[in-house]
Amino acid sequence: MQTSKYLLATERDAEWGLTISTVGREEIVPGEEYPTKGHADGYYFDIKKGRTLDEYQLLYQPEGEGVFSSAHLPETKIKAGDIFLLFPGEWHSYHPSSTKGWKSYWIGFKGKNINDRVKAGFLSPEKPIYHVGYS
């Protein structure tokens, strides 16, 4: 089941330096088709071909497991308690394990504030996965 919200930002909103474009959650049960139908145009992707976005997205997986790959990272296992960051213009693909599924929460965002953090080296496409745990 997927619940998501896509938000439209105005030029005035962008003056804050960070705008939110999407938030949501999804639970994929073992054996369920992925990606699920219902993604907005520009977000749906074929896991074999991957995609690029024009925003950052932070995804948190509190349950299950799967894999993630990007232009800077070969296929890497994602496990419960991991977060991973998608970078604008960076090719990527990910999907849950067909035998375990996963729960996922995400937020999409963009703006000068996050761009500055990346330029300063706080975040990098070479190291997009962090294990933060779960409760």
What positions do the PLM features span?
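Generic protein-terminus/edge-of-domain signal
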Residues: M1-T76, S98
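Amphipathic alpha-helical segments enriched in hydrophobic/aromatic residues interleaved with Lys/Arg
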Residues: K5-L8, D116-S135
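Conserved beta-strand positions that form and line the central face of beta-propeller blades
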Residues: T22, S93, P128-I129
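Short, charged/polar surface micro-motifs in flexible loops or helix N-caps
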Residues: P30, E63-E65, I83, G89-W91, ...
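Conserved hydrophobic/aromatic beta-strand scaffold that supports enzyme active sites
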Residues: L58, I83-L85, W106
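Short acidic-glycine-tyrosine-enriched beta hairpin
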Residues: H72-F87
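Ligand-binding loop in jelly-roll beta-barrel domains
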Residues: E75, G89-N113
